[in-house]
Structure formats: C-alpha cells, structure tokens
C-alpha cells in the first residue's frame, strides 16, 4: 500500500476518484479506485471557518485526521477544488485551501523510502503533540458552549429549547471515549471513525446565536419551531425565551412578518380597523396568528376555521379570511362574475391556468409536514383604496387576466341561469348599485344612468367603481373587497366578455379606459 501511495498516485490529480455515491471505499479495495488524497494532515483555513460559522473544533479534529473513508477531497459535481465531502449527510463544505500544501502530500519517486519514513515519523510526532493540546482545549470549548437540539440528526444548535453538551453526551459523542481518543494514535482507522462522528456533528451543527432584534416583528418560523433557516441573516426578532413571548400583542400583525404597507393600510390611511388586527383578534381566522399561538402538534386538529380558504393566484396564496359561502363576499363574487350563456370550452384549458382552492387545515397540515416557512403570502395592497395608483391596477389586471379560473366560471354556469345583462348582475350588490346610480350633489335630476349594455359602458362602470369607491361604503364590504382583491375580479371578468360576445379589439378599449385619468362617469364618455 505504501508503494502504491508513493509511486502510483498521479502528480497532477487533484480530486478523489472515488464514486460520488460512496458505493466503494476510498482505498479502492476493488482495484478500480485510486486512494483518497486526504492521507496527510492539512492546515485548515481559519478564514473559511469564520465565514462558514463552523466550530473551530471541527477544523482541529479534521486537520488531525490522517485518513478516513468518510472524507475525501473532491473536484466533481462542479465543486471548488479543496471541498470537503461528508458522506453521512451528503454535504460539501469548502474547508481546506488547495494549493502547494496538497501537492506536498505526495512524495516523488526520486525520494528514498528512508527519507520518507523519517519525515513520516517526524510528522506524526508533531501531529500527536498538537492533537493532545488541541483536544484539551476543544473539550473545554465544547463543554462551555455546545448545546444539542433533540430530534435533528447531526444538528447542534444554540437555542432556547436545547440541552447542554454535558447532558447530551449520548446524542453527540455517542460511542466516543474521549480519554481513549486522546491516547490513541491519530492514524488508527477505527479511532478516526469515532473522531469523525464529532466532526460531522460540529460541521453540520449551526452554532448560531439567533439575533435578538427588539422592536422588530417576531420570526414566525423561529417562534413555532425554535430555529430559523436564515440564521444570523434573519431580519426579525428571535427572543431567547420564545414561549414567554406569546402574548396577545405578539399574535398581532408583527408576528405575521408582513410589510407595514400590507398590515396597516386601512388603519393608518382610512381610520378603519386593519384586516390583520381584526383577524388576529379572532385567533381562528389567520394561519399566521393560529400558528404563532399553537404548537405544531396542535395545528390541523380542527382548532381553525374550516370554512377559510386559501386561493393560489399567479403563483401566490391569497387568504379568504371570511366565510366564502355565507358573507357578502359571496355576493361580490357571484354577481360580479355572472356571465351570460357561459359554456366550458378549450380556451380555458390552453389560455387560462386554474386557480387552486385549498382549505386552511389541509394547507397547514402540509406546511407543517413539509417544514415550510411560507404558510401563505399576502399580496401587496394598493397604496390607496379610494383612488389607487393606476399603474398598480393596470399591471395587476394585465397579469391576472391570464389566470382567471375556469372552475369558478363553470361553477357560476352551473348555478345560475341566463342573467339579462351586466347591469342586472351588479344590481344585487348594494355598493355597486350605489355607484351605478351615483349623482353629483344628490341631484335627483341627474340620477338617470349614463351607462348602456355594451362592453364600453361595462368597463367604464368598473373603472368608476374602483376609482370612486364611496366613503360611506359599509366596512364589511370594504374589508371583503380588500382582503380578496375582488376589486380586480370585476373588471377582469368583464374584460373577458369579448371571448363570448364581442370583437377582440374591445380588450384595447378596456385598457384605454383604465389608463385614461380623465374618464369620469358623470358624462359617460371617454374624454
């Protein structure tokens, strides 16, 4: 084997040719593999240690290993030369700096075996002396700061619900006898296997002190599971005692990790109770509030409102925080989207992408099962409700028009007969009917509607309903419209009318109405 290592190892080879799947041992017992290049101690890079946040004990342990079948230097899979490949968990970490030191691991054919043996003996003496000193420091270091999180294989986390290393020797060091390790030779293969157990744990363990950021919203994932995938880069607050922080205030909007514009638009700009505040007051309404106040085992056990529905639109999940079947939301959806003689056709298969409905309990169960941090996503609300920025509306309408669902249209087609016109549809919605009959200064002589049954008037009404949203509108209707973005659905469905009842250029007329800031319902014309 020594002759094989010294004479047959190619000088220009910089990677272990052992199979990536680790089906064969690194020493090449089958005769088809070359031995691992990691047969000599390699000086670790302290810079890499700090940047990776890996414990120094991992570097000291690995730098003392002469050879092990668990580690190899590899350049495959697009990895940088000098990466450390850990077999037990399949993780690659760039620990060592490739260069002249790696090249010096190989003895040339011109070097005599006597000199090689002398160098080997001197090197082993230095390694043994350094190992004994570093192992003493490492164990003191580990006893002072290491904590172990149960239930996670190879996970070493410094967190609020963890045990100390002293109480978890069975979980971390397992079968390792520290006294025996200190007295054994570093080249002993059986000893290396035990050393690597501690090395793998320290490599993969996230020795991270999660940042405490007073004044910032609580990290929803950390509050629920006790750890955060963003570690020190997370911008939210990670209190040490996360269980004592679950008060009524923390279940409010700050626990949802939402932007200020999304959570406080109604409360700050219009003096109306925020949707998030109202929903979190009843902790069964929002997934985030429920998950913040409940353990993962309690989620999905029927403690949430089964009538709540999440709707996936344009790849994002939107929350219907009211009962879809019994509230004014049903009226806004049904009577705004009623169509005349809608028939299911292939256009919805090729042009439109279905909207996926998911019940809250099913979504939470899957999210907890998949360890998903994004239970739902709140779409950015327009900066103003009464007079929103037209760019926001037009951009959303252009995108959303490609995702109108055929399930909902089919549902309307099966439920309703043949409504006479779009005017009859909106007449069942009080707030829309108020807009339709609006007259300046309540002058009864001007109550005569300016709208007709054609598509232009329908689109014109849609724009007026959006841009002249009445201040006297009921709070329930306003919340329903905002929370479900139904203010988008009405003009979008109306824009689909050319598919059934008109020429294609009507779509352009609709966009002209939306883009025209001078359009006003009082004259019923596009100025």
Swiss-Prot record:
Mapped zinc finger ranges (C3H1-type): 213-241
Matching PROSITE patterns: ZF_C3H1
InterPro entries noted in UniProt: Plant_ZF_CCCH, Znf_CCCH
Span list, region Disordered: 103-127
Top-rank lineage group of the source organism: Eukaryota
Keywords in alphabetical order: DNA-binding, Metal-binding, Zinc, Zinc-finger
GO MF terms, alphabetically ordered: DNA binding; mRNA binding; zinc ion binding
Protein name: Putative zinc finger CCCH domain-containing protein 64
Organism: Oryza sativa subsp. japonica
